[in-house]
């Protein structure tokens, strides 16, 4: 499986993401500068890393969502290929309309940077199949605008379609229904505020994130084997 | 040229932690009468006059300036000499 890690001006978790999938999970990966849209041909999975794309001007992720590379990523997602957005990547996915809702200022306004316990609400997804259902994992969070919000109708739809993939045990930012990560209806786009790529080795304080990348690689291999 | 003033506000019911912090700070300065504060954005554009100007500004608001999931907007148009 070949991943592209998209690098925007202001991305700062791109190398962590690259390290996690390539050096630790053992997949092919390439850092792709946001103007190099032709490099996405032949890529299997797209990874949108954390950081502050375009300095988070106007709203987090809003400027990046209008870039040419996002049009390519929309096409990629429409074909059912996997897209993972973490932190600023999640903000870009909601701003692009690839995922519903919005990410707002944390309830207590402060930027938070520490480990949080999450619950894997759904392990029947492309991204979480190696976890147990309701497994508690520890991932770092590092955000100032990570409070997930959506209207009542959208929330009901998320619940009805099992689109809530991760929740916080101790909701640190005021997210609706403790939501930490959601997927799209089709199941090939996942957005989450916590950082699985910073939890792939015990040295980092947790290696709970590794199973997320390994799930993606294993599920890709399975679907490829079926198609081949 | 037209001057466009766009006002963006959080939808009613959407938690506004920045507004809350401002309200609490005002109260701590002794302004107990402040019952609520909401923070919005104010954007000024200079736009060449042309057909469908209002429609085009509405489109700009929907596509970029405001996030319709959480924000409402309104705008004023005025001529610039």
Curated annotation (Swiss-Prot), chain A:
UniProt cross-references to Pfam families, sorted A to Z: GATase_5
SUPFAM superfamilies associated with the record: Class I glutamine amidotransferase-like
Protein name per Swiss-Prot or TrEMBL: Phosphoribosylformylglycinamidine synthase subunit PurQ
Domain Glutamine amidotransferase type-1: 3-226
Catalyzed chemical reaction(s): N(2)-formyl-N(1)-(5-phospho-beta-D-ribosyl)glycinamide + L-glutamine + ATP + H2O = 2-formamido-N(1)-(5-O-phospho-beta-D-ribosyl)acetamidine + L-glutamate + ADP + phosphate + H(+); L-glutamine + H2O = L-glutamate + NH4(+)
Tagged with keyword Hydrolase: yes
Keywords: ATP-binding, Cytoplasm, Glutamine amidotransferase, Hydrolase, Ligase, Nucleotide-binding, Purine biosynthesis
Pathway participation: Purine metabolism; IMP biosynthesis via de novo pathway; 5-amino-1-(5-phospho-D-ribosyl)imidazole from N(2)-formyl-N(1)-(5-phospho-D-ribosyl)glycinamide: step 1/2
GO cellular component, one term: cytoplasm
Reported function: Part of the phosphoribosylformylglycinamidine synthase complex involved in the purines biosynthetic pathway. Catalyzes the ATP-dependent conversion of formylglycinamide ribonucleotide (FGAR) and glutamine to yield formylglycinamidine ribonucleotide (FGAM) and glutamate. The FGAM synthase complex is composed of three subunits. PurQ produces an ammonia molecule by converting glutamine to glutamate. PurL transfers the ammonia molecule to FGAR to form FGAM in an ATP-dependent manner.
Positions of the catalytic residues: 87 (nucleophile), 195, 197
One GO biological process term: 'de novo' IMP biosynthetic process
EC number: 6.3.5.3, 3.5.1.2
A GO molecular-function descriptor: ATP binding
Protein species of origin: Oceanobacillus iheyensis (strain DSM 14371 / CIP 107618 / JCM 11309 / KCTC 3954 / HTE831)
UniProt cross-references to InterPro entries, sorted A to Z: Class_I_gatase-like, PRibForGlyAmidine_synth_PurQ
Location of this chain's protein in the cell: Cytoplasm
Subunit structure: Part of the FGAM synthase complex composed of 1 PurL, 1 PurQ and 2 PurS subunits.
Keyword Hydrolase: yes
């Amino acid at each position: 499986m070949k991943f592209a890690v998209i690098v925007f001006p202001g991305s700062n978790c791109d190398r962590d993401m690259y390290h996690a999938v390539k050096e630790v999970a053992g997949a092919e990966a390439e850092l792709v500068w946001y103007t190099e849209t032709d490099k996405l041909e032949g890529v299997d999975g797209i990874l949108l890393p954390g950081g502050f794309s375009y300095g988070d001007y106007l709203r987090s992720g809003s400027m990046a969502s209008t870039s040419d590379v996002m049009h390519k990523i929309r096409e990629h997602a429409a074909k059912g290929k996997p897209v993972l957005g973490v932190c600023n990547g999640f903000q870009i996915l909601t701003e692009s309309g690839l995922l519903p809702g919005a990410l707002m200022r944390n309830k207590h306004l402060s930027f938070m940077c520490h480990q949080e316990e999450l619950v894997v609400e759904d392990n029947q997804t492309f991204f979480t199949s190696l976890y147990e259902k309701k497994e508690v994992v520890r991932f770092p969070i590092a955000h100032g605008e990570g409070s997930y919000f959506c209207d009542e109708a959208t929330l009901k739809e998320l619940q009805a379609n099992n689109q809530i993939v991760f929740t916080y045990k101790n909701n640190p930012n005021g997210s609706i229904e403790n939501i930490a990560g959601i997927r799209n209806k089709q199941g090939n786009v996942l957005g989450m505020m916590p950082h699985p790529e910073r939890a792939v080795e015990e040295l980092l304080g947790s290696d709970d994130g590794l199973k997320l990348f390994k799930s993606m690689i294993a599920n890709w291999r399975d679907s490829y084997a079926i198609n081949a | 040229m037209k001057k466009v003033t766009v006002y963006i506000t959080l939808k009613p019911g959407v938690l506004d932690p920045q507004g809350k912090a401002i309200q609490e700070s005002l109260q701590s300065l002794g302004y107990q009468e402040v019952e609520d504060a909401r923070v919005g954005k104010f954007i000024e554009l200079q736009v060449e006059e042309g057909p469908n100007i209002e429609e085009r500004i509405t489109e700009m608001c929907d596509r970029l300036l405001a996030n319709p999931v959480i924000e409402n907007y309104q705008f004023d148009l005025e001529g610039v000499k």
